[in-house]
């Protein structure tokens, strides 16, 4: 146990004694942040678009089924459907805005 503790202490001392080049390290961190921002933007927008498409499909199917059961309610159902589709599409647009912020105005990137 003493050998392991001594080895850990020796490695820690070497790590703390090493000189660091902060601008180079920050640039490397910025590269990783940019890479993960691209991944997050693509994945987030893809999931939002998939969820929006599923929601719109279910909304249209329910409206068509309701109109088939009661044709007299068709115009009211269509109005309600268009409002629901606008709300669903707004969620996808919000995801697009967040993705664009992550790509072009990332607050986590430190400028030098």
Swiss-Prot record:
InterPro entries: ATP_synth_csu_bac/chlpt, ATP_synth_F0_csu, ATP_synth_F0_csu_DDCD_BS, ATP_synth_F0_csu_sf, ATPase_proteolipid_c-like_dom, F/V-ATP_Csub_sf. PROSITE patterns: ATPASE_C. One of its GO terms (molecular function) is lipid binding. The record marks 89 as: Reversibly protonated during proton transport. Keywords: ATP synthesis, Cell inner membrane, Cell membrane, CF(0), Hydrogen ion transport, Ion transport, Lipid-binding, Membrane, Transmembrane, Transmembrane helix, Transport. Signal peptide: none annotated. The chain crosses the membrane at residues 36-56, 81-101. Pfam families: ATP-synt_C. It is found in: Cell inner membrane. F-type ATPases have 2 components, F(1) - the catalytic core - and F(0) - the membrane proton channel. F(1) has five subunits: alpha(3), beta(3), gamma(1), delta(1), epsilon(1). F(0) has three main subunits: a(1), b(2) and c(10-14). The alpha and beta chains form an alternating ring which encloses part of the gamma chain. F(1) is attached to F(0) by a central stalk formed by the gamma and epsilon chains, while a peripheral stalk is formed by the delta and b chains. F(1)F(0) ATP synthase produces ATP from ADP in the presence of a proton or sodium gradient. F-type ATPases consist of two structural domains, F(1) containing the extramembraneous catalytic core and F(0) containing the membrane proton channel, linked together by a central stalk and a peripheral stalk. During catalysis, ATP synthesis in the catalytic domain of F(1) is coupled via a rotary mechanism of the central stalk subunits to proton translocation. This is ATP synthase subunit c.
């Amino acid at each position: 146990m003493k050998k392991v503790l001594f080895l850990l202490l020796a490695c820690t001392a070497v790590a703390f004694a090493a000189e660091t080049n902060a601008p180079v390290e920050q640039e490397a961190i910025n590269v990783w942040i940019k890479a993960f921002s691209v991944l997050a933007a693509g994945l987030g927008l893809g999931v939002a678009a998939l969820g929006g498409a599923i929601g719109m499909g279910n909304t249209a199917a329910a409206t068509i089924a309701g109109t088939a059961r009661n044709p007299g309610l068709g115009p009211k159902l269509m109005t309600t459907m268009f409002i629901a589709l606008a709300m669903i599409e707004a969620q996808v647009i919000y995801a697009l805005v967040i993705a664009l912020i992550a790509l072009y105005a990332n607050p986590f990137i430190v400028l030098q």
